[in-house]
C-alpha cells in the first residue's frame, strides 16, 4: 500500500524551472554551493578518507616511537597530543562520517527521490563537519593539540592541569561536530518519512534505510549528552563554573556519565549502517532475496535500543 501522495507529471514549464533549480553551475561558487546529494556524499567520503590518512600517520608516529626502547622521536607532550588526536580523529571524524557519505549518496536512489528532503541542511551538515575537523587540526599551528586522550576524562582536563588551549580546541571542535551530526540525522529521518517514491511503503524499505534511520534516531538521543559535556567543559575552563571540580562541589564522574551515555550507543551507530549495506550487497550478489527481511529489521531496531 502506498503511503505517499500519488505521482503527478509536472508541466513542461514546471519541469524546465526545476531543471534550472537543480542544475549545478560549473563555477567555483556553484560547485561550493551545490546541494546535490551525490556530490555531498562524495565530499563526505573524500574528507573522511583524508582524516583516515591523518589518523593513520599519527598511529604510525606512535608505533615508531614504541618500536624500540628509549627512542626519542617524540617528546612526552607530543606523544600525548598525537595519541589524543589519533583516537579523536578515528572515532569522530572517520568512523561515522564515512558512513554518512555512503548514506547521502545512496539514500535518494534507494527511496526513489530526487534528493534529500532538506538539501541545504544536508550541505550545512557537511560544511560544519569539515569546519570542525579543520578547527581541531588548526590547534597544531599553535602547538596546542588536545593532549588528554580522546575520552578527555576529568579532572585532567581542568584548567589547572591543562592551562593552555589544548582542551578548548577539543571541546569546541566536538561541539561543532555534534551540531553537524544532529542536523544530518534529522535530514535522514525527514527524508525517510516524506520522500519515499509512490508505492515505497515502510515495510518495503531496504535494510540500509532501516539501519541508517535507526542510528539517526539514536544520534538524536545520544549526542545531546556529548554536546552538554563539551559545553560544561568549556565553561569549566573559561568561566570557572566547576561542573567537574570536586573541590568546588562538582563531580569528575559527571563527565564520564555524560560521555559514555553517548559512547555506548556510538559503537552501534558506527556498526549498523555497515551491517545494512552488507545485508543489501550479499543478497544482490547471491541473486536471492534477503531471508527474513522483517526479522532483520526488528533485529536492527532492537540493536539500536539495546545500545543505550
Q: Which residues does each predicted region cover?
A:
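Membrane-embedded and interfacial regions of multi-pass energy-transducing membrane proteins
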Residues: 2-308
